[in-house]
């Protein structure tokens, strides 16, 4: 996607489980914008230090320079200089990319909407579901408000089927359902699975209301 089919500012969201290529797709889109000589700003949560502290990195090894910030308010401050409301596009910015969007709090929603309303193309990548297969943070509202949504799948390394869920592992076994939601990790802590075998100890992560 070089030039978006949407005129003016808008919001694009790329979601999926771990290992589905979300960061890879974010890097691809932003790199194409850079090739087109568009002005791009990239942000990532400071909590994500798995590969590079100051780069967005895919599991395949592709990277793109980024600013690590603790929260959405820090992104606002970086763009406005004073953390004020963004009634106009930030000077020198055409496209803004944010990786691991699920780690930012609810303050991310009004920020990206302000940016889009101000004429900026905003591209987010993140997990739509946590390891319990429940909606992750503010991602549901971001998905609902986006002009463009792409849901990617990974590949289950057990059966080879398209994987839509993220299973957290502790000592090679599924994590407990009541374990903390946020745990930054990669292949040592997570695997991608299809719906059917996705479970967490202490509870089924995708309970069906028809089961009772």
Curated annotation (Swiss-Prot):
Q: Where in the cell is it found?
A: Cytoplasm
Which GO biological process annotations does it have?
DNA biosynthetic process; thymidine metabolic process
Swiss-Prot/TrEMBL keywords: ATP-binding, Cytoplasm, DNA synthesis, Kinase, Nucleotide-binding, Transferase
Q: What is its main location?
A: cytoplasm
Which residues participate in ATP binding?
A: 16-23, 99-102
Statement: the UniProt record of this protein carries the keyword Lipid biosynthesis: no
**Name under which the protein is recorded:** Thymidine kinase
Q: Which organism is it from?
A: Deinococcus radiodurans (strain ATCC 13939 / DSM 20539 / JCM 16871 / CCUG 27074 / LMG 4051 / NBRC 15346 / NCIMB 9279 / VKM B-1422 / R1)
């Amino acid at each position: 996607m070089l030039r978006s089919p949407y005129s003016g500012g808008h919001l694009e969201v790329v979601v999926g489980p771990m290992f589905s290529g979300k960061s890879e797709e974010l890097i691809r889109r932003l790199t194409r914008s850079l090739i087109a000589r568009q002005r791009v700003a990239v942000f990532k949560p400071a909590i994500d230090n798995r590969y590079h502290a100051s780069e967005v990195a895919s599991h395949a090894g592709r990277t793109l320079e980024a600013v690590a910030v603790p929260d959405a308010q820090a992104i606002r401050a970086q763009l406005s200089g004073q953390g004020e409301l963004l009634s106009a596009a930030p000077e020198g910015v055409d496209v803004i990319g944010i990786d691991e969007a699920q780690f930012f709090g609810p303050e991310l929603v009004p920020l990206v909407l302000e940016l889009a309303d101000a004429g900026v193309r905003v591209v987010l990548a993140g997990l739509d579901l946590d390891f319990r297969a429940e909606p992750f943070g503010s991602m549901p509202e971001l998905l609902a408000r986006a002009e463009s949504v792409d849901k990617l799948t990974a590949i289950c390394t057990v059966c080879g089927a398209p994987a839509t869920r993220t299973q957290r592992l502790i000592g090679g076994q599924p994590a407990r359902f009541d374990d903390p939601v946020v745990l930054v990790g990669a292949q040592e802590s997570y695997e991608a699975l299809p719906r059917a075998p996705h479970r967490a100890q202490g509870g089924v992560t995708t309970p069906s209301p028809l089961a009772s």
